[in-house]
């Protein structure tokens, strides 16, 4: 079972991803977070294999959250979800240890395959 945390400041995106990913028997969405601070709090309480991380979030953005997650939990994989594919924020997150990125709007099949692949 792959334990997934969804981090996005838009509730609709968080809940939609949770519902869709919940249809896969090998994925367990163990939590959602609205910002990077909530991501770090979740990781203190739960074991997470893969984080789906938005880049632009309040309080602690996806870049700095990626840096902190990889420093404290180096085995946790991070897939960046973004609306921009040439964004400097994305490249910064990749430098800090994100496993890859996907554009928002990607098919759910591609998202599922990415989660399985990085895990």
Where are the regions a protein language model picked out?
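C-terminal output helix
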Residues: 88, 106-119
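Two-component/phosphorelay signaling modules centered on CheY-like receiver
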Residues: 11-31
